[in-house]
Design a protein with these regions (language model features):
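Extended active-site and interfacial segments that coordinate phosphate-rich ligands
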Residues: 8-14, 65-72, 134-147
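Alpha-helix initiation/capping motif
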Residues: 9, 19, 50, 66, ...
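Dual-mode signal for accessory low-complexity, basic/Gly-rich regions
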Residues: 24, 80-178
Length: 178
């Protein structure tokens, strides 16, 4: 069955972009890794998500922590400040002032000063992501996030993918989501 894969490079400095040859080779490798894929039966298995799946998962998490989702009560994480939602080894922070960062900014789209913040600390929700309107609706202070989050950083355990999957005799490695 035909498969497709992708790979890309992004940077503010064009000189730091990966070469077209490397990008093509990585896309080809990822495509080849999908050959022979097949459905599995329903079962309970340990799951490991590859790092390239993380942005999508983290994006859904951050959306659930947005002020709008909170005041509209449409989030699967309603009223979750201080609650543990992830393993203790996971922390998620926002660093809006990284020099050369793709999304670095001193102010959000409402003119509120941005600042470093922990969104999730040791698996617990530390901050919602608030613009001025949602902050007022929730009787909280704006977090400098009108227009979204910037330069998200995820602290996690230092194991490589190979180290994470080596103790698993039968499991599922998720490399892409639909």
């Amino acid at each position: 069955k035909m498969q497709k894969g992708y790979y890309y490079s992004s940077n503010r400095d064009p000189e730091l972009l990966e070469s077209a040859d490397h990008i093509g080779a990585m896309a080809a490798t990822r495509t080849e890794q999908k050959l022979g894929a097949k459905k599995i039966s329903t079962q309970r298995l340990p799951i490991v998500f590859s790092s390239r799946v993380a942005p999508g998962l983290i994006g859904h998490l951050l959306s659930a922590l947005s002020g709008k989702s909170q005041y509209e009560k449409t989030s699967f994480l309603n009223d979750s400040l201080g609650k543990k939602i992830l393993p203790s080894f996971v922390s998620i922070s926002e660093k809006p002032h990284i020099i050369g960062g793709l999304a670095s900014t001193n102010y959000d789209s409402e003119g509120v000063t941005t600042y470093n913040k922990e969104i999730v600390t040791n698996g617990e929700i530390a901050h919602y992501i608030l613009d001025g309107y949602s902050a007022r609706k929730l009787d909280m202070e704006p977090t400098g996030n009108s227009g979204g989050v910037t330069n998200i950083r995820i602290n996690h355990n230092d194991q490589s993918l190979a180290q994470m999957i080596s103790p698993i005799s039968k499991g599922l490695l998720v490399t892409e989501l639909m």
